[in-house]
Regions:
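Active-site neighborhoods of metal-dependent hydrolases
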Residues: 1-46, 57-206
Length: 206
């Protein structure tokens, strides 16, 4: 009912996130991450009854076939166009090709699915004044993370403390491996460089 009312009031459609990259301010996953098919089907049926609007889905495609089959069922049930975010993943660089092929096949079967490609890669800001940095899962960092930035800098300049950051084992954190991919971490620069060359990475410079 909420979706139907929203579209009648002028909304373009219904968008849902199925990616771990979207979180609440507190860092928790969005409730839509593991939404059941029954819930999504109810929404697709509501959109179908209105006969207007789009569906948008942002997915990690961790189980590509299962996910694509689900999305095709949703698109078919809604009878409306669906847009799916398509991007290249570091761990599976060819997955986007498979996704586009699956979209083409689904459309041959009668669906109306469009791959939506980002104009540039999605990045994540890392720093000592924000929530993510390469040492966030290290015990040494957790000792100072609640201090003011000025106080943190004092510790970061201390050689003994820096050694701890570089040598202590990292604890558990969902983003731990991602924020330590040194060959894919780059200084932002001033002005910002959004398409950095490989030789400007932290790994290359070190």
């Amino acid at each position: 009912k909420l979706v139907a009312d929203g579209i009648r009031a002028g909304a373009l459609g219904f968008s849902t996130s199925r990616t771990i990259n979207h979180r609440t301010v507190a860092g928790a996953f969005t409730p839509t991450l593991g939404a059941a098919e029954l819930e999504l089907m109810d929404i697709a049926q509501a959109v179908n009854k209105i006969g207007s609007g789009w569906l948008q889905v942002i997915s990690d495609f961790d189980n590509p076939k299962e996910e694509m089959d689900l999305l095709q069922r949703l698109a078919t049930t809604s009878g409306r166009p669906m847009t799916i975010t398509v991007l290249q993943r570091n761990d599976r660089p060819e997955l986007w090709r498979d996704t586009m092929a699956d979209i083409a096949k689904a459309n041959l079967d009668g669906s109306k699915i469009v791959g939506q490609v980002l104009t540039r890669p999605t990045g994540v800001m890392l720093g000592f004044q924000i929530s993510l940095n390469p040492f966030m899962a290290c015990g040494a960092w957790r000792e100072i993370e609640d201090l003011s930035h000025k106080e943190k800098v004092k510790f970061l300049k201390d050689s003994a403390f820096k050694k701890r950051l570089l040598t202590e084992p990292q604890g558990e954190h969902l983003m731990r491996t991602r924020v330590m991919e040194w060959d894919r971490i780059f200084p932002l620069g001033d002005p910002p460089e959004y398409e950095p060359l490989p030789e400007t990475s932290i790994a290359f410079q070190s």
